[in-house]
């Protein structure tokens, strides 16, 4: 455990340098997260957070990906309920499919069912930052429109249309589904993982997350 002043770059670097990994839960990340990511990238320290702010994650990718590769820092965003279950769940399903059927699934559909929880003040503030960015920043709007916006540069297009927006009859389970509030984050993270892994699930791979609502 290290303690430092957040005011100076030197104190942030010192804290990051003394740590093996930095885990931060303080949002909105658009407002508070960037200096800590920069410090971890500069010192080669691993980093994880809980962000669901897609526009900020895209900014961090564009600013720091190459430098993080050079320094050895592993910068892993969205390590909470968004998006660990979706990301690792997809990886496990695809690994099972490859071992059992000698091929990955063309489509993975994630059903967000049976969970409950509350929304923190930081999460509410993050939503506010996201809406403000979408209203004022053209890059943020493009990031939120593009289902592949978190993929590496040059890989930000594909066949997947993005998150479900309206209630829909489910073709796999037969019942009705509603849009998942986590889908705009989770689906993008899964697509980024597929790209970073070298497309083991193919470039035609589709990922959707929905909420079952009944027959």
Residue spans for each PLM region:
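Rossmann-fold NAD(P)-binding glycine/threonine-rich loop
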Residues: 33, 38, 51-73
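Gly/Ser/Thr-rich loops at beta-strand to alpha-helix junctions
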Residues: 54-56, 80-87, 115-116
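C-terminal catalytic/substrate-binding lobe primarily of soluble NAD(P)-dependent oxidoreductases
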Residues: 70-72, 95-215
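Short glycine-rich anion-binding loops that position phosphate/pyrophosphate groups of nucleotides
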Residues: 28-29, 80-81, 153
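Hydrophobic beta-strand scaffold residues
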Residues: 46-47, 75
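Active-site-proximal alpha-helical scaffold in enzymes
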Residues: 86-96
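Conserved Rossmann-fold cofactor-binding substructure of NAD(P)-dependent oxidoreductases
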Residues: 3-21, 25-32
């Amino acid at each position: 455990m290290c303690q430092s002043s957040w005011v100076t770059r030197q104190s942030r670097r010192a804290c990051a340098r003394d740590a093996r990994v930095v885990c931060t839960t303080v949002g909105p990340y658009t407002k508070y997260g960037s200096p800590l990511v920069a410090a971890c990238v500069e010192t080669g320290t691993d980093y994880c957070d809980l962000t669901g702010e897609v526009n900020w994650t895209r900014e961090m990718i564009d600013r720091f990906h190459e430098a993080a590769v050079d320094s050895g820092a592993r910068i892993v965003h969205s390590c909470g309920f968004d998006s660990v279950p979706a990301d690792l769940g997809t990886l496990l399903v695809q690994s099972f499919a490859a071992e059992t059927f000698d091929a990955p699934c063309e489509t993975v559909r994630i059903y967000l069912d049976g969970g409950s929880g509350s929304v923190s003040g930081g999460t509410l503030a993050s939503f506010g930052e996201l809406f403000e960015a979408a209203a004022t920043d053209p890059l943020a709007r493009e990031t939120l429109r593009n289902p592949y916006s978190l993929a590496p540069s040059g890989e930000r297009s594909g066949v997947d249309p993005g998150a479900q927006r309206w209630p829909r009859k489910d073709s796999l389970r037969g019942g009705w589904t509603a849009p998942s509030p986590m889908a705009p984050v989770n689906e993008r993270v899964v697509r980024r993982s597929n790209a970073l892994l070298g497309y083991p699930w193919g470039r035609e791979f589709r990922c959707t997350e929905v909420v079952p609502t009944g027959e």
